[in-house]
């Protein structure tokens, strides 16, 4: 906190020690910080939201960490589906009140075949299963745009590489971290890039 404060950033964190956690860090004043947007039956630290003012409009920021869901034949997968359903329900409500929303974080969703190095090996994975991808598209259909795909229609853009089997060196990655924004905010965005430098040092 002190490091961010020394650089004039305001930070809000919702975490579980050694487990889940989300945060919002901003140079603009944050208001209406919430960690109770959805009904999470396991009460895990997976979502935080805050409002900022931009050109006299309120923009809602939502940072998420969606459950992984693997293995698919366990309660972990059911939890992921329920969690995503609760998020979609909340987005429907939020979208009616505010048409300026930025939803970002680790979605643990591979949206399409071009978003993973070997799609066949993930066909029955909780990150790529059809019903999970449908839930992701349901979010988009609420009036959101996938910012990376908006600027890069077919370009590879991995955000995660496993720490085993030389995944980084082989570029065996996947795109599971996303920025979804209300469509009317797209004209406020100039570009989007994935910073691979921190991962290259691990």
Name the predicted role of every residue range.
Residues 53-55, 93-97, 142:
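Alpha-helix C-cap/termination motif
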Residues 42, 79-87, 128-131, 172:
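Soluble or luminal CAZymes and related metallo-dependent hydrolases
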Residues 1, 61, 87-115, 147, ...:
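Active-site beta-strand/loop signature of hydrolases that rely on acidic residues for catalysis
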Residues 38, 66-85, 120-124:
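Surface-exposed cleft-lining segments at the edges of enzyme active sites
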Residues 65-67, 108-110, 152:
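Catalytic metal-binding/acid-base residues of hydrolase active sites
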Residues 21, 83-90, 135:
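Internal, well-ordered alpha-helical segments in soluble enzyme and binding-protein domains
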Residues 1-71:
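Structured beta-strand-rich core segments of catalytic domains in phosphoester-bond hydrolases
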Residues 3-5, 32-36, 93, 113-202:
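Metal-dependent phosphoester-hydrolase catalytic domains
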């Amino acid at each position: 906190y002190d490091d961010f404060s020394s650089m004039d950033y305001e930070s809000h964190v919702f975490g579980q020690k050694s487990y889940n956690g989300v945060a919002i860090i901003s140079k603009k004043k944050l208001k209406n910080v919430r960690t109770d947007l959805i009904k999470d039956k396991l009460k895990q630290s997976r979502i935080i939201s805050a409002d900022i003012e931009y050109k006299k409009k309120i923009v809602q920021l939502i940072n998420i960490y969606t459950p992984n869901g693997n293995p698919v034949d366990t309660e972990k997968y059911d939890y992921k589906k329920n969690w995503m359903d609760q998020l979609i329900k909340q987005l429907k409500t939020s979208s009616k009140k505010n048409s300026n929303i930025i939803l970002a974080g680790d979605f643990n969703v591979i949206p399409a075949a071009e978003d993973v190095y070997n799609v066949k090996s993930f066909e029955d994975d909780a990150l790529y299963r059809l019903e999970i991808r449908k839930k992701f598209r349901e979010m988009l259909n609420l009036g959101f745009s996938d910012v990376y795909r908006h600027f890069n229609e077919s370009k590879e853009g991995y955000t995660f590489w496993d720490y085993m089997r030389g995944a980084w060196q082989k570029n065996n990655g996947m795109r599971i971290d996303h920025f979804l924004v209300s469509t009317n905010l797209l004209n406020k965005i100039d570009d989007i890039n994935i910073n691979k430098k921190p991962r290259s040092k691990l």
